[in-house]
UniProtKB/Swiss-Prot annotation:
It holds the Pfam family Photo_RC. The modification N-acetylthreonine is found at residue 2. NCBIfam families: psbA (TIGR01151). The record marks 190 as: Stabilizes free radical intermediate. HAMAP family: PSII_PsbA_D1. One of its GO terms (cellular component) is photosystem II. Disulfide bonds: none annotated. Fe cation binds at residues 215, 272. Keywords: Acetylation, Calcium, Chlorophyll, Chloroplast, Chromophore, Electron transport, Herbicide resistance, Iron, Magnesium, Manganese, Membrane, Metal-binding, Oxidoreductase, Phosphoprotein, Photosynthesis, Photosystem II, Plastid, Thylakoid, Transmembrane, Transmembrane helix, Transport. This is Photosystem II protein D1. Chlorophyll a ChlzD1 binds at residue 118. 2 of the reaction center chlorophylls (ChlD1 and ChlD2) are entirely coordinated by water. Herbicides such as atrazine, BNT, diuron or ioxynil bind in the Q(B) binding site and block subsequent electron transfer.
């Protein structure tokens, strides 16, 4: 009898826990994805803060020349970063217990791998949690689909690119100047500015910003006035009201006259699908581009291929970019290479008589 009561009580406790986890009445929805998201993101955030403040220098290139990244070792907010895991570790899974000591783990950049892997798991669970809450509320799933774009971008630079290059040391540093360094080296080694998928990503981000500003300003400018001229139009609304707040017909008419008729949407759903799809698809393409360049399928390199009828080279901006890439490649990791890879790959001229 006692055993039966204990089992019922434990089942009841588990049932109450399940109901609490999946309840949409909580101030913040947790969900089953949240059970994994909360500890992983808390771990990533905590280790990031501690390492950004106090981590010792890291031997990023694996040549016994540690690079400082924390505030206590001379950096500021702009120059500071979590330095990527050492090239000596490569792609090996490197938790604390795999190192001989905590000092060795810190010297080899163990915190970077810990932060990145927990962060990627956490943001993936956040995306799943968006879908889960939408499902519980009977909503459509497109919020999580839209969020998949930044998740794909983060996965590309923190995981796919290091896998393709063979080492977590090639991942993006977790800091402002470190991000810029990553971008410059990426351009030098992969010519990303000449990659069509990066161009689509630029169009997606800049175009999305433009369309967002246009939409917000149009809606704000075409509010249906519910008040007199002597009081704010904002006073005529309450949060969550059923009635339309703005007149899409008026906005459509304004924009159609400003540019031309078919440049404007007269259907709210089509308009908002476009506002969502444009930046999301652009960022998807950029993430796909980085994931292919990770395996050295690089941007266009015309190599002085534009010639006149006599075969003479016509210099283009593409050739200027190639020269800039060589300069950037010469300067990065100066003590790890004697020559940039592009120069070292060329066969040496014969010196015989």
């Amino acid at each position: 009898m006692t055993a039966i009561l204990e089992r019922r009580e434990s089942e009841n406790l588990w049932g109450r826990f399940c109901n609490w986890i999946t309840s949409t009445e909580n101030r913040l929805y947790i969900g089953w994805f949240g059970v994994l998201m909360i500890p992983t993101l808390l771990t990533a955030t905590s280790v990031f803060i501690i390492a950004f403040i106090a981590a010792p220098p890291v031997d990023i290139d694996g040549i016994r020349e540690p690079v400082s990244g924390s505030l206590l070792y001379g950096n500021n907010i702009i120059s500071g970063a979590i330095i990527p895991t050492s090239a000596a570790i490569g792609l090996h899974f490197y938790p604390i217990w795999e190192a001989a000591s905590v000092d060795e783990w810190l010297y080899n950049g163990g915190p970077y791998e810990l932060i990145v892997l927990h962060f990627l798991l956490g943001v993936a669970c956040y995306m799943g949690r968006e879908w889960e809450l939408s499902f519980r509320l009977g909503m459509r799933p497109w919020i999580a689909v839209a969020y998949s774009a930044p998740v794909a971008a983060a996965t590309a630079v923190f995981l796919i690119y290091p896998i393709g290059q063979g080492s977590f040391s090639d991942g993006m540093p977790l800091g402002i100047s470190g991000t810029f360094n990553f971008m410059i080296v990426f351009q030098a080694e992969h010519n990303i500015l000449m990659h069509p998928f990066h161009m689509l990503g630029v169009a997606g981000v800049f175009g999305g910003s433009l369309f967002s500003a246009m939409h917000g300003s149009l809606v704000t400018s075409s509010l249906i006035r519910e008040t007199t001229e002597n009081e704010s139009a904002n006073e005529g609304y309450r949060f969550g009201q059923e009635e339309e707040t703005y007149n899409i017909v008026a906005a459509h008419g304004y924009f159609g006259r400003l540019i031309f008729q078919y440049a404007s949407f007269n259907n709210s759903r089509s308009l908002h699908f476009f506002l969502t799809a444009w930046p999301v698809v652009g960022i998807w393409f950029t993430a796909l581009g980085i994931s292919t360049m990770a395996f050295n399928l690089n941007g266009f390199n015309f190599n002085q291929s534009v010639v006149d009828s006599q075969g003479r080279v016509i210099n283009t901006w593409a050739d200027i970019i190639n020269r800039a890439n060589l300069g950037m490649e010469v300067m990065h990791e100066r003590n790890a290479h004697n020559f940039p890879l592009d120069l070292a790959a060329v066969e040496a001229p014969s010196t015989n008589g």
